[in-house]
Amino acid sequence: MKKLFSALIMGAAIFTLGSCSSKNSNYVKIGLLHSLSGTMAISETPVRDAELLAVKEINEAGGVLGKKIKVIEEDGASDPSTFAQKAQKLLSEDKVASVFGCWTSSSRKAVKPVFEQYFGLLWYPVQYEGMEASPNIMYMGASPNQQVIPAVDYCAEKIGKRMYLLGSDYVFPRTANRIIKAQLVQLGGEVVGETYVPMGHSDFSAIIDEIKAEKTAVIINTLNGDSNIAFFKQLGLKGIDSSKIPVMSFSIAEEEVNFIGTDILKGHLVSWNYYETTETAMNEQFVSRYKTEYGNDRFTADPIEAGYIAVHMWAEACKKAGSFDVEAVRVAAKGLSYTAPEGTVTIDGNNQHLYKQVRIGRINENGLIDEIWATPGAVKPDPYLSTYEWARGL
């Protein structure tokens, strides 16, 4: 990994990005790259909205280094190859200073070589499966030790150790479940079933019958996008609610809860680092601003908050560097702390992930999430799970 960092950093001397869009103008360009159409639009559009709110706040406060931010937006269309094409356009044609975007690990992995080739900088706002660290990506979401592992520990202790693993068929669910299976061996638990479905899949009847037949204690859900709508609705039609078989989800937050319906989701569990109900002074301001901008019927959520703070942390790193150049900003971001709605977060200089507090929540009847467990403070990111004996060899 260190060799990769060194090789890519050397590329910065040959291909310096960011400053070329801002030296001779009164604005600096950034790119927003999210799925505004397709199966992932339900989740990614609100993240885009939060990033635009952050841009508005920064511009109203005078901009960054005397320049206003100009947004160039592209639609990844829920397709990894489209994400890669749009990333190349933003970097090589639009010459943006940084890009904020992606959700699925498939889209992130599709754009990763593009950012490394053009020495751009992606600020990635979503929890993921770990096992990665690129000098050209700032990871604003949780690594597995800040979401998945604590959630499985909680379920094993509080609910039961017979777990059914259900996920979309792509990188994050498969890698997360590989981690979970190793963890359950250490916990003395059992995987009673493991199923992956294509993105956008909508028929879960046979899978739910299997879940019931296996006397499952808890379902570990790594479905993404609108498949969650079909799954939870069909779960309810089969007579399964949170009192019978609770579901622990890693990609459902407040926006999805209120789209799917609280009558179906109430009582089920989620694991994140932030909720709309998180009690900090900064969060009160953030929630108020977000609802003022987009309406009281909208909700904040973990990836939304991560997208919001990503833009603000980029701006702070630019100020610290005195430059928009990618390498200068990347170096300035190391060790940077920011008072976020979730609490103070800090960029780990070794892997460009955030220190984050872990919070497990239960969905309530009002469409919000009540925190029921949390770590005492921010947890150091460990994307390669180097501190877990049972994870060696994964």
What are these regions (language model features)?
Residues 4-5, 11, 17-394:
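Extracytosolic ligand-binding ectodomains
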